[in-house]
Amino acid sequence: MNFINKYLRNLKPYKLASHKIWAVDPKDRKGILKLDWNEATVAPSPKVEARVRELLDGPGFFNLYPTTKNDRLLAAISCFIGLPEENIQYFGSSDVLHEYICRSFLCEDDKVIVLGPSYDNFRLTCQSVGAEVSFFNYNKEDFTFDAAAFEAVLAEKKPVMVYICNPNNPTGNYHTPEYVQHLLETFPQTLFLLDEAYNEFAGPSSKDLVLKYDNIIVTRTLSKAFAMANFRIGYLLASEENIAAIGKIRNPKNISTLSQEAAIAALEDADYMRAYVEKVHEGQAYFVEQMARYADRITVFPSRGNFNLLRFASKEEKSALIKHLADNDIFVRETTQDPSVESCFRVTMGTKDQMKRVVSVIDSFYKK
């Protein structure tokens, strides 16, 4: 007897990158540059550590479930994002949030279009509830976007949901709020899921559109620019009706008190995050400038996120450089989710000093 969910039986799993750093003794991790998961390359705000230590040293509460409605956290998100608390809800990461969205808005055989190649975990989440996922890809040569062709596909297929990672991981494409608004008005019967995991690096958000349109949900995270990946905090911005729908199945007690309080501390020190973003932009500009010396070997695609996609003349050259970087304790992300990125890898951008080290190791590879 096969008890496995019929949608899981032939489901292609999300391919995780190696997380070798956790196999390294903690005292030896300092020299590792982990540039494969688009995490921040610095620690969170010192106020986060101070708050966590305060909790650990204070009266015990770990035997209790966390609060199921943290008004202080909702207020902190509202203050940072500039939207009413009624249009906000927090979750245990945006990955978990995507699962709730799929369970709340998708039924068997519903059509979903992913603008890709993109973050592949969302594809898996949709398919696990029986939705039919197809892709509209950026141009395979240069990852430019054909808006007319995209909209023609939406008009033809009439999807229930469209997923747009903005800026897109791994290609770095960015769509303006004005264009997103155009999509919302042109396709009112389609729910657009805007994944703004990297928005702090990119510029204007589409967040304000949730106050006017009910066919958009924006998801955000503290894992990237706020350097809070280990705390697993994400949040959504949506109409009150859409939040209420997700709330029917949301488990409000699966976010630890430590994570909730750390998130409040991080949001209250948003200037720390903004300073880090500026350092990343500086490091990114330096890296792109230096890679121009290898223009005959490497194509560096422009990006509005804290990462860049690099394409090589051959898969063999790409693989050899990945190994060389790893041998020097620098880990990057091999991209395999689509043929258009098979000769590529993605590099998380860090500070200028960190990117100088990456450039130095790449230089040593090409001087061999």
Identify the residue ranges that each predicted region occupies.
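N-terminal small-domain helix-loop-helix segment of the aminotransferase-like
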Residues: 2, 9-93, 100
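PLP-dependent aminotransferase class I/II
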Residues: 43-45, 215-293, 299-301
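Conserved core of the PLP fold type I
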Residues: 49, 60-187, 198-213, 217
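Short acidic/glycine-enriched loop/turn segments that link adjacent beta-strands
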Residues: 70-71, 230, 304, 339-343
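Short loop segments at secondary-structure junctions
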Residues: 238-242, 268-269, 312-315, 352-353, ...
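Conserved PLP-binding catalytic core of the aspartate aminotransferase-like
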Residues: 281, 294-328, 345, 349
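PLP-dependent enzyme catalytic core of the Aspartate aminotransferase-like
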Residues: 327-328, 337-368
